[in-house]
From Swiss-Prot:
Changing S479A: Does not impair RNA binding. Following synaptic activity, forms amyloid-like oligomers. Aggregation requires an intact actin cytoskeleton. Interacts with STAT5B; this inhibits STAT5B-mediated transcriptional activation. Interacts with E3 ubiquitin-protein ligase NEURL1; this leads to monoubiquitination and activation of CPEB3. Interacts with CAPN2; this leads to cleavage of CPEB3. Interacts (via C-terminal RNA-binding region) with TOB1; TOB1 also binds CNOT7/CAF1 and recruits it to CPEB3 to form a ternary complex. Interacts with SUMO-conjugating enzyme UBC9. Belongs to the RRM CPEB family. This is Cytoplasmic polyadenylation element-binding protein 3. The CPEB3 gene contains an intron-encoded self-cleaving ribozyme which is structurally and biochemically related to human hepatitis delta virus ribozymes and which may play a role in the regulation of CPEB3 translation. A polymorphism in the ribozyme sequence which influences cleavage activity of the ribozyme may play a role in episodic memory with carriers of a rare C allele-containing ribozyme showing significantly poorer memory recall performance than T allele carriers. GO terms for molecular function: mRNA 3'-UTR AU-rich region binding; mRNA 3'-UTR binding; mRNA regulatory element binding translation repressor activity; ribosome binding; RNA binding; RNA stem-loop binding; translation factor activity, RNA binding. Residues 441-532, 549-631 form the RRM domain.
Amino acid sequence: MQDDLLMDKSKTQPQPQQQQRQQQQPQPESSVSEAPSTPLSSETPKPEENSAVPALSPAAAPPAPNGPDKMQMESPLLPGLSFHQPPQQPPPPQEPAAPGASLSPSFGSTWSTGTTNAVEDSFFQGITPVNGTMLFQNFPHHVNPVFGGTFSPQIGLAQTQHHQQPPPPAPAPQPAQPAQPPQAQPPQQRRSPASPSQAPYAQRSAAAAYGHQPIMTSKPSSSSAVAAAAAAAAASSASSSWNTHQSVNAAWSAPSNPWGGLQAGRDPRRAVGVGVGVGVGVPSPLNPISPLKKPFSSNVIAPPKFPRAAPLTSKSWMEDNAFRTDNGNNLLPFQDRSRPYDTFNLHSLENSLMDMIRTDHEPLKGKHYPPSGPPMSFADIMWRNHFAGRMGINFHHPGTDNIMALNNAFLDDSHGDQALSSGLSSPTRCQNGERVERYSRKVFVGGLPPDIDEDEITASFRRFGPLVVDWPHKAESKSYFPPKGYAFLLFQEESSVQALIDACLEEDGKLYLCVSSPTIKDKPVQIRPWNLSDSDFVMDGSQPLDPRKTIFVGGVPRPLRAVELAMIMDRLYGGVCYAGIDTDPELKYPKGAGRVAFSNQQSYIAAISARFVQLQHNDIDKRVEVKPYVLDDQMCDECQGTRCGGKFAPFFCANVTCLQYYCEYCWASIHSRAGREFHKPLVKEGGDRPRHVPFRWS
């Protein structure tokens, strides 16, 4: 078949006679099988230029003819390794190739010399195409499948045009025109068996973009039969070639194909071919003209996207618990937990906030309250409205913090894990333009030099803001020196405490600052601020808080936090659902007492029966007193106010046989019985009377 093309170059035969002659001519089986995989160039290079082709692509090289003119052939697997003659050499005269001889460029149009130059020269803006082709902005130019197209627009494009064009008369012999090499006609393409139908605009866009004139035949049905036979014979050859894609892994990263081996382990959806010579079979979700438009679908089964040198590992690149749907994490909102995580897909802020609010309002187990207070449920709000003020528990937070968890989740560094973090490096939060206090304005300073006085202490800390130095029994002692080497700094502004914390050095979870005295220079002293978030801790938020199951713990060391008190009591008696540290309503510093609420009566009775508890935690080891917490606004449990005129009951019997509030009349009546005459009533003393702190809802 190739000898006929070369020996009949001087004389032109009619097109129908060429097709009839090709159908009658017997072809060896090897020639037919090599036909689809050996596309012919539209130009005939010189003999010395074709010498490198068999060495680099031996599988695609046909038997070399004996004539001086040889047809250039390229490998179907490596479109990037196309060997075409330099553009400076004038090509010899061409003739229209027969449909049986002009084979399809298979997966890309870069196999022909003219089309390859069009890709290389016209893909980048500002460079004039060498071959005279022109790119239209309004038509997608599917030059190579990696630039946004699929295989269907290229395979069988010319053959589709043959069926739509009426058969013209036999072409007359035309003289060769060596002066017009840019108008070289590409080889005729034949339809791929894998793509029986073509997109309606594929041929229009390709023809308009490149201005190539299809090679028309007088017998399209005959050419279709030849094309179908050749394509069917090439099925086994093409499939065997793609099955050996692992062996040509190095060829994808050849100099003519610098982008082929890039990101082999990534998601093929992210692989966007941006370089010339990218390997065939790498799809791209972006259109070269309009990146927002995805390419049209195709029936072609693409070859493997990227050859991998090693098998993929089964472990995901994200943690498995990131996609849980039990609301146990805040990484992805509920709407996005069913699909893989995509860093380029920014979900809406509204969904994120609603998801965090829903997660924060779920029952808290072993979590701290944020510094402005816990995210309150409806039952929690009801309990605090009725009992929190009577119990003297100070909640230093506006109510809006409980409704919107934005500040708590984004600005609170220790939210959700405050039991393990000190929260000393957290900045002061702001809400609605108003600063929200995070620390008490009263700061403990320990390890002072023995010869330092009040004025020297004030001078050492005045740079952080206005303050007053105080220590226990200062007014009675009339001394200018702290008696036990420690003092309290009372700052006027909470921001001064934050500045002091920022200036300290942290070691083993403790803060230190160097202070000088007349005899000691730069002595490290311990700075111990009180974080307001350490005042309350919820062990089990699913249980209601019952003030009649709450105990009072006296003599609590001031460094002890609510979480530590809850852990100690839960370890001893179990059933702890809440623990709180009593703080001063003005300075919000611990007063040395705490309260623990239990979820069951057994734990409550066990705690009050012990009377004393040994608190041990880190450096703390102290024996404290435990007794029932007495409320002063309870009605008599015996008469319900009928005998006392509706007054509150002043007495509470802490004996396990009673555990009730009594008015004076009922107390005398009940405890006059045998076995109860030794019960002692508990009375709310004036000094221990709780203060009613109204909620700050705004």
